């Protein structure tokens, strides 16, 4: 279903694309197509990686200024390594997270996973592969959030012998709703660029990482992540807000209504154009619904969350 829209013009999504447009405050699905089907998600995987790291940091009271050592496995992944991390380099969790989420840095994602995974194994008194332990935490998070069409096989989304991880637009919406509740998550996804550095044998290496999501900073868009691979096509998840509506209820009370949409595009050939078009359409549909008094939404148009 296209939600009653002609799917042409305005950068609307093409055929074969999977997409979902959601009002994040009511979980109202404003527009969707092929949104329940499982497909490869490439670097969108790193959203789950980031959230597992941040949940661990909060649970263990570990500051993101903590320094991690780049593991040997980071040198064997391939794919994006925008700041040239090599095994043995030392980088803060914060800078590794910035490079992973903004510049889709595979080596930084692997570094985060190895550090957190080894801490989890140590705390539980178990041996094993730290990165495999971390991936199991990603899959546990997916299970808790009802992401039944999701399976993570690594922390970065690169295609390898065991596949590249798969999900659906609907499942990714569940993950993003959870992630957006966390201000520390949105800090990393909302910046257009950030200075990061790491230590290599006592020498500081400094870089500016630039967000691969070129829509961030326009149209109220403040996240979230890009992904692309031969099997996944072009993917992007964006979120945008508009100023709150504030109504004076008298007697000093105010009614404040926030407005935020989430747009997920998978398997595209023009992810930014399609996402921007779907966002514009989404706001039109949303405004129509609000102006009609926000009538009750049919149950099949509400994203089921867990």
Language model features: what each stretch is:
Residues 3-18, 117-306:
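Penicillin-recognizing serine hydrolase domain
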Residues 1-170:
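Active-site-adjacent loops and short helices of periplasmic peptidoglycan-processing enzymes
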């Amino acid at each position: 279903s296209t939600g009653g829209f002609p799917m042409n013009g305005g950068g609307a999504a093409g055929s074969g694309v999977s997409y979902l447009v959601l009002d994040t405050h009511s979980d109202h699905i404003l527009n969707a197509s092929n949104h329940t089907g499982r497909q490869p998600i490439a670097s969108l995987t790193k959203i789950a990686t980031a959230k597992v790291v941040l949940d661990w940091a909060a649970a263990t009271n570990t500051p993101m200024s903590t320094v991690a050592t780049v593991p040997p496995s980071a040198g064997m992944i391939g794919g994006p390594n925008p700041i040239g991390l090599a095994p043995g380099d030392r980088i803060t969790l914060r800078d590794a997270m910035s490079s992973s989420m903004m510049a889709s840095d595979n080596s930084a994602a692997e570094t985060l996973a190895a550090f957190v995974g080894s801490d989890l194994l140590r705390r539980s008194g178990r041996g094993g592969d730290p990165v495999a332990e971390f991936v199991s935490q990603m899959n546990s998070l997916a299970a808790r959030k009802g992401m039944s069409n999701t399976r993570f096989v690594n922390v970065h989304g690169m295609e390898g012998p065991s596949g590249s991880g798969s999900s659906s637009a609907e499942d990714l919406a569940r993950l993003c709703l959870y992630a957006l509740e966390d201000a520390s998550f949105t800090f990393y996804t909302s910046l257009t660029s950030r200075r990061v550095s790491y230590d290599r044998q006592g020498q500081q290496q400094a870089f500016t990482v630039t967000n691969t999501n070129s829509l961030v900073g326009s149209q109220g868009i403040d996240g979230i992540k890009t992904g692309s691979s031969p099997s996944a096509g072009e993917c992007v998840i964006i979120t945008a807000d508009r100023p709150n509506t504030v109504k004076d209820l008298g007697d000093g009370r105010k009614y404040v209504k926030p407005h935020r949409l989430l747009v997920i595009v998978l398997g595209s050939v023009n992810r930014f154009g399609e996402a921007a078009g779907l966002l514009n359409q989404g706001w039109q549909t949303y405004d129509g619904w609000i102006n009609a008094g926000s009538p009750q939404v049919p149950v099949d148009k509400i994203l089921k969350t867990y």
